[in-house]
Amino acid sequence: VQQKLDYVYKNGRKLLHIVNQLLDFRKAEAGAMPIHVAQVNVEELLQDAFALFKENAQKRAISFHIKSDLEGRLFPADRTYVETILMNLLSNAFKFTPDGGSISLSLWTEGDTYGFTVRDSGIGMSPEQLTRIFERFYQVDGQRKGTGIGLSLVKMLVEKHHGTITVASEPAQYTEFKVTLPADMA
């Protein structure tokens, strides 16, 4: 009985995540998601996200590291949006990285910007896939679970911060997403 309850709970959480993501996407698309900028410890957000995926990394023997040059500094951001960006990028990294692979997160500051990079040793993407990766409902691999809106939502949220997101990838090698945000949003 407990196993069945755990199964129902786990799948209920997945369904809730999908519904919330669809609602967020629709709100962002309609311009109904105002940005609430505050001084945020982005390093702390990344550590929290890291902690959520740590058990999964251990179970799958995925090397999972974090590197930060931010030293606890505060940066302007919408905390909820940055959490959503991080969770989507990390979720994708885990989805497409095989057991025994690696995922790294880097936080950095450069001039009047700061940002983070999520890199995995997953399946990678072809040049054609890279051109479509931020299209809504586009999925690199239809065999894996997902809605195809995560990266579209990520791009919208990054742009609400007046930032940029880039992706580099080689098939069967790696994928790397780099999010760059302004250090001053005044």
Regions found by a protein language model. Name each.
Residues 10-15:
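Short alpha-helical segment of the dimerization/phosphotransfer core of two-component systems
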Residues 26-37:
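Helix-loop junction within the histidine kinase core
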Residues 36-51, 83, 115:
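A conserved beta-strand-to-alpha-helix junction within the catalytic ATP-binding
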Residues 36-41, 58, 63-73:
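Conserved catalytic submotifs in the C-terminal HATPase_c
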Residues 100-112:
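Short beta-strand/loop element within the Bergerat-fold HATPase_c
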Residues 125-137:
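Short conserved segment of the HATPase_c
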